[in-house]
Amino acid sequence: MSVIPKELFGLRVEVLRSKRKTSVLYIIGDELQIRVPNRVRDRKIVEILETKERWIRNKVIQLQNQRITNKREFISGESFSLFGRNLYLKVLEGGKVGTQLIDDYLITTVRISEIGDLRKSRIKTYLEKWYIHEAYQKLEEKVMRYSKIIRVSPREIKVRNYKTRWGSCDNKGRLTFNFHLIKAPHEIVDYVVIHELCHMIQPNHSKFFWNEVARFDPSFKNHKKWLKLNGADLMR
């Protein structure tokens, strides 16, 4: 019996069966969705993946190239965001190194001796540390709020620098979120938090799961679409 891979070219493979008559592939965020008729067997799904392997690989390369084109310079004046609010990087020399938010500026201090690529690397590191710290605090607040509403009890919350996914929930109720998520507007962040908490009720992406998400986020389809369209820019 053929086994459907869980991951392909860095994308999570998600099979969605329905009453549809044809099979189709979509790349949505960090997921490769295979939408097939109910009658289609796993072996046929594997054949579809093998047939479309070149297309999938080329799409992944295309998305990676888009991210490279939008590569950051980490210089003063460069724009960042926090819950949809525009912030601007301001690089200073000397004093205590690190990043702090003052008004609309991410004040990032580096050593005078750090120049060129080393300076960019340090600025990136300081910014990521700041974002991770902020993400943990803000996401913990949102998880606590929505876990009471949804009536689930997550065991642990972590923040990581995921390359493709926005969040995850394992079978022990441990939640992990991408720190880049807090660059999105609040309603988008709320959607991802609700999404992962609903996985504590239903681990897959079945119709029942999406019905649960809709109970707590009636506009989840719009939020999901926004994330698909703007996700690559948030990851920068």
Task: Set out the residue ranges of the language-model regions.
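Active-site-proximal or metal-binding-adjacent scaffold patches in catalytic folds
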Residues: M1-D190, M200-R236
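Walker B beta-strand of ABC/ABC-like P-loop ATPase nucleotide-binding domains
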Residues: V193
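Walker B catalytic acidic pair
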Residues: E196
